[in-house]
Amino acid sequence: MLKRDCSSVVGSERERDGSSLALKRHCSSVVKLLLPHDVVGLILERLPVESLLRFKCVSNQWKSTIESQCFQERQLIRRMESRGPDVLVVSFADDEDKYGRKAVFGSSIVSTFRFPTLHTLICYGSCEGLICIYCVYSPNIVVNPATKWHRSCPLSNLQQFLDDKFEKKEYDFPTPKLAFGKDKLNGTYKQVWLYNSSEFRLDDVTTCEVFDFSNNAWRYVHPASPYRINDYQDPVYSDGSVHWLTEGKESKILSFHLHTETFQVLCEAPFLRERDPVGDSMCILDNRLCVSEINGPAQLIWSLDSSGGNKC
């Protein structure tokens, strides 16, 4: 009886083990049958970045999908369509907020973030979630606050020149404003220095340097802008181009196409004439490039329409 009982127990354990193994195989086959990888990709697109970072360890296939550029572009578009814009609050003080905080306001998320640098200059806005922070004396840094990824760039010729003058205690040079955007045709990010040449004892009207992330190098662009720029204001990136306001009695909106690397005048800003250039600025409102003038208590805003004209 004892032997029969033992054999029956062993047999039942084997049956359970076999059933468990069969169940695992069955579940795996059902998951593969019901959730092909393209469907899994569609589900992953709906997840926040924090979850995607954790799910990269599920499998090599998931990791490859999440790290692919096409997936990241789709996930960004879906996130932008599903809720309001996120707001990033940057503090340069050495406070105790080491890990960042988040607050939810309606469909938007407000986050704090500590950048991995002491630079205090930031390019206007963001480009697909990337922030560019810079200093004229040290390398620029591009940061993704959502993933904590960052990349340092080599010094441009302008930065090397200013750093040399700083070491010699020659401080009588302006601080140009850096532009950051994306070449929408080939998908590469670029940084642009555009500055008035005479302030740096150069011959041309303006000088332009471009950093291409695909080859990790700076180079000059010829010809540069034929118009001097308003160097009080930050350049603004929009839809594959970077924009500046020009100097002069009749201010213009100057555009630099990041793929063709050519300059053109989009339009004139007829109300920005012979006024204090510090009160003029550009911004993005409702995905449109806008020009603003502050005149006492009043503020006048012009926006470019889809045909490239302007309207108030």
From Swiss-Prot:
Pfam families: F-box, FBA_1. Residues 29-80 form the F-box domain. SUPFAM superfamilies: F-box domain. One of its GO terms (biological process) is heat acclimation. Gene3D superfamilies: 1.20.1280.50. SMART domains: FBOX. PANTHER family: BNACNNG10540D PROTEIN, F-BOX PROTEIN CPR30-LIKE. NCBIfam families: F_box_assoc_1. This is F-box protein At1g11270. It comes from Arabidopsis thaliana (Mouse-ear cress).
